[in-house]
From Swiss-Prot:
Region annotated Disordered, chain positions: 1-117
Family statement: To yeast STD1/MSN3.
Superkingdom to which the source organism belongs: Eukaryota
UniProt biased composition (Basic and acidic residues): 77-87
Biased composition (Polar residues): 9-47
InterPro entries according to UniProt: Std1/Mth1
Biased composition (Low complexity): 48-64
GO biological process: D-glucose transmembrane transport; signal transduction
Name of the protein this chain belongs to: Protein MTH1
Pfam families linked: STD1
Primary gene name: MTH1
Amino acid sequence: MFVSPPPATSKNQVLQRRPLESTNSNHGFASSLQAIPENTMSGSDNASFQSLPLSMSSSQSTTSSRRENFVNAPPEYTDRARDEIKKRLLASSPSRRSHHSSSMHSASRRSSVAESGSLLSDNASSYQSSIFSAPSTVHTQLTNDSSFSEFPNHKLITRVSLDEALPKTFYDMYSPDILLADPSNILCNGRPKFTKRELLDWDLNDIRSLLIVEKLRPEWGNQLPEVITVGDNMPQFRLQLLPLYSSDETIIATLVHSDLYMEANLDYEFKLTSAKYTVATARKRHEHITGRNEAVMNLSKPEWRNIIENYLLNIAVEAQCRFDFKQRCSEYKKWKLQQSNLKRPDMPPPSIIPRKNSTETKSLLKKALLKNIQLKNPNNNLDELMMRSSAATNQQGKNKVSLSKEEKATIWSQCQAQVYQRLGLDWQPDSVS
């Protein structure tokens, strides 16, 4: 009966890792395998088969010696070694860390392969895995820590150009209902059409409103950079911070002290009143959306932008109305002056015109006065004297042309109505008292 040798399977490898009682049992196992008749297989097969027990015996004896010489380290030494290795990894550069991790990982792989047949391979692999079990995880953690720790070493941006300071996209500043309602109402820059107004210096101050940001960019650090413009005649620009989670007082103060329409020289009281009204309206709308009354509004980006644009529109309309009012008042004064200086026929003053009974009414005093005037001005006749007197009177009247309160109130109301109608606003002009 032919008996074949057991195949070298994983089961056989597991059996090799089981502890052996003594060296004699190894020889017994080898002798039992050698008892197979030689005539049942060829010579080459027999030679290779006889060499198998010898290699297994030598491998098992080597493993036994390694087991006797191996000493398990106490847990505190293991933890201390692990901490020391981590410290060295953190102190090394990223390239050295990756090279060190790969070399240690390959070394651990070679060690596990060399000791695959040993009885203590499981213990050794578990000891190695406790330190280098997840090199990718350690590398990821080191990368994150190094990126955070190395960022302050980079030079922070303290000066930016106007193009770099302005936002590149605007889709998060407006609700989807506005952006998706009618594509024809969207400008080429992605903003709605109502952000473009035919008002005095609107484009300039719209750019200034876009420089109000809700958060700092990472490359700015903890401070707002300076906006650089080219040219001496360029207007002033600066970045302002207004977080989404801000109190009403912070929002009002930021709007009032902004650079919006600084050239119009609007009075502080008007800007403060306009900012308070804008924030109060936004609070009512926020409470209607959220259904709760918050001490500090946690605004969304569209709500936040809506507050800025409403305040900008209020002061822009006021600046436009005041500009139109000054022009209308100047034009009205010129018209009144022209009406008062209409050309009249060249006639002497009424006191000089002789009456019908001049011979009876003229006194000697009047005759003497007229004679003295003619004697003092022998080269000028009476008509020239009358024209000089009329010119002096007109010059005095020109300096005294003014408008009454009723006239100013009427002109102001007309300017407001024209601006509101031109912009399509349903606002009501101030009533004339």
